[in-house]
Swiss-Prot record:
<dbReference type="GO" id="GO:0006955">
    <property type="term" value="P:immune response"/>
</dbReference>
<comment type="function">
    <text>Matrix protein of the sea urchin embryo spicule. The function of the matrix proteins is to direct crystal growth in certain orientations and inhibit growth in others.</text>
</comment>
<feature type="domain" description="C-type lectin">
    <location>
        <begin position="92"/>
        <end position="162"/>
    </location>
</feature>
<dbReference type="GO" id="GO:0030246">
    <property type="term" value="F:carbohydrate binding"/>
</dbReference>
<dbReference type="GO" id="GO:0009897">
    <property type="term" value="C:external side of plasma membrane"/>
</dbReference>
<dbReference type="GO" id="GO:0038187">
    <property type="term" value="F:pattern recognition receptor activity"/>
</dbReference>
<feature type="glycosylation site" description="N-linked (GlcNAc...) asparagine">
    <location>
        <position position="102"/>
    </location>
</feature>
<protein>
    <recommendedName>
        <fullName>30 kDa spicule matrix protein alpha</fullName>
    </recommendedName>
</protein>
<dbReference type="InterPro" id="IPR016186">
    <property type="entry name" value="C-type_lectin-like/link_sf"/>
</dbReference>
<keyword id="KW-0732">Signal</keyword>
<dbReference type="Pfam" id="PF00059">
    <property type="entry name" value="Lectin_C"/>
</dbReference>
<dbReference type="InterPro" id="IPR016187">
    <property type="entry name" value="CTDL_fold"/>
</dbReference>
<keyword id="KW-0325">Glycoprotein</keyword>
<dbReference type="InterPro" id="IPR001304">
    <property type="entry name" value="C-type_lectin-like"/>
</dbReference>
<feature type="signal peptide">
    <location>
        <begin position="1"/>
        <end position="20"/>
    </location>
</feature>
<dbReference type="InterPro" id="IPR051004">
    <property type="entry name" value="DC-SIGN_domain-containing"/>
</dbReference>
């Protein structure tokens, strides 16, 4: 009888875990569920004017790139990855210029644009990926965009903007660990975080304005798109909540027991600036090291 009860409990736990992996899933046993990003409604009136691999939104074309510097030595040879960890911020900006004339690291002018970048990029991520934007500390001790546009909007992680110390740049999609017993998660936020631009390599988002479109028109055209309808919904942008990446396919309690300290194999991991785990790319549990 005891064995039957044990099997029944295991089956119920497995069913709950499977349900938690589905969008909108989750429950009292295994909290979590899918990302909170909503569905995409196609707009048949859209016409694309951007270069290949670039995505148009409003008056801008965007490119999400790993910064791995993919290149082909010869036609008969495979593609070579020069840098799998991304690029420093200044190099990332130069890379954008190589991808398209007049392109630079993205300039974020509004909350609506920030929300679009967040939803668009996170949908393509398999694992958390910090991304450079174009904001960086200028020589006069002020934040400035690589595009040369004025800084009219910011979305820093803290209430006040950090000091524009030399060597700092802004990144987006920082990852924080949400430790849970059954289902560890990584939270990706749409806020900006200062980072050492010459010490840290990240992916990047490039931006350019197609011919005939200027940055001055960004506020008027860089709004979310909606399918045709009699009355459009309110256009007021709302701040996006964090997306939760569900990572652990197994039960941590069963896979990490038997250690010296209270029967656990977990131990502390050195963390980088802002308490992000130094090995979250390599460690399958993102927050613990067996």
């Amino acid at each position: 009888m005891r064995g039957f009860v044990y099997v029944l409990v295991c089956v119920l736990a497995l069913a709950s875990f499977s349900r938690a992996q589905l969008p909108g899933g989750g429950g009292p046993v295994l909290p979590g569920g899918g990302p909170t990003i909503g569905p995409v409604n196609p707009d048949p009136t859209r016409t694309e004017v951007c270069a290949k691999f670039w995505v148009q939104e409003g008056n801008s074309c965007y490119l999400f790139d790993s910064g791995a510097f993919l290149r082909q030595v010869a036609a008969s040879r495979p593609v070579v990855v020069n840098n799998e960890n991304g690029l420093f911020q200044a190099a990332a900006n130069m890379y954008c210029g190589q991808m398209h004339p007049n392109a630079s690291l993205v300039t974020v002018n509004s909350l609506a644009e920030n929300n679009f970048l967040y939803e668009w990029a996170v949908r393509m991520m398999v694992e958390p990926e910090p991304v450079w934007i174009g904001l960086h500390a200028g020589p006069m001790g002020q934040w400035q965009w690589y595009s040369g546009e004025p800084v009219t909007y910011t979305n820093w992680e803290r209430m006040t903007a950090p000091m524009a110390e030399p060597g700092l740049g802004a990144m987006i999609f920082d990852a924080d660990i949400i430790a849970q017993m059954f289902n560890n998660q990584v939270e990706i936020t749409p806020q900006w975080v200062p980072e050492q631009a010459i010490n840290d390599r990240h992916a990047l988002i490039c931006e350019y304005h197609p011919s005939g479109m200027t940055a001055a028109a960004a506020a008027a055209t860089n709004a979310p798109t909606f399918p045709p309808m009699a009355t459009a919904p309110p256009m007021a942008a709302t701040t996006r909540g964090p997306v939760m990446f569900q990572n652990n396919p197994r039960n941590l309690v069963n896979s990490l027991t038997g250690g010296r300290f209270g029967g656990s194999l977990l131990h502390e991991i050195p963390r980088r600036q802002r308490m992000r785990p130094s090995n979250y790319r390599k460690n399958p549990y993102f927050g613990i090291q067996p």
